[in-house]
Curated annotation (Swiss-Prot):
Keywords on record: Allergen, Disulfide bond, Secreted
Subcellular location: Secreted
Chain ranges of the SCP domain: 38-186
Disulfide bonds: 21-87, 167-184
Major subcellular location class: secreted
GO CC terms of this entry: extracellular region
Organism: Brachyponera chinensis (Asian needle ant)
Tissues with expression: Expressed by the venom gland.
Protein name: Venom allergen 5
Family: Belongs to the CRISP family. Venom allergen 5-like subfamily.
PROSITE patterns for this protein: CRISP_1 (PS01009), CRISP_2 (PS01010)
InterPro entries listed in its UniProt record: Allrgn_V5/Tpx1_CS (IPR018244), CAP_dom (IPR014044), CAP_sf (IPR035940), CRISP-related (IPR001283), V5_allergen-like (IPR002413)
Ranges where the record places region Disordered: 47-67
Pfam families: CAP
Amino acid sequence: TEGGAVHTMCQYTSPQPSPNCGTYSNAHITAADKETILKVHNDERQKVKAGQETRGNPGPQPAASNMPDLTWDNELAAIAQRWVNQCKIGHDGCRNVERYQVGQNIAMSGSTAKGPCNMNNLVQMWINEVNALNAADVSSMPSDGNYFMKIGHYTQLVWGKTTKVGCGIIQFLDGKFYKCYLACNYGPAGNMFGAPIYQ
């Protein structure tokens, strides 16, 4: 437990999708999904590192001297998959591992047609939050709640001290829409208020 929150793997002991999900499919990350998720994350991180991210409010974003590529972590992915398998939209209460605190990004898309979830589009939703980020704030993560809601997925994705990512996906029928629900867990966690987003 952390601050009274029960860890996702302890709270939800079944590896199967919850009855909350109703009709579901695609309840696992494929090798191709993993490759896409890593590529989209690392393409943006390399772009930032090179000083080529021109977007922002205002931009351009500063270049980074320390921006390692993320690598996949199966433990983080297993916790993310267990969480999306609950079909509860939002962040889980505790997802930390012994190694470090763990951050999380979530995204959702919907379609009337059933088909594979588009990992590129889901991750791009987080990257597009750069449009709201004031480049001057990279040196110290702002704590303003309303502002954080607009930039927090992006800032975790490019957090300089984060090195690992692991994700889970599920597609479930919600009324007439097939919803794709993606969660990615990041270690060590980013979005520490007052700390540099990257250096």
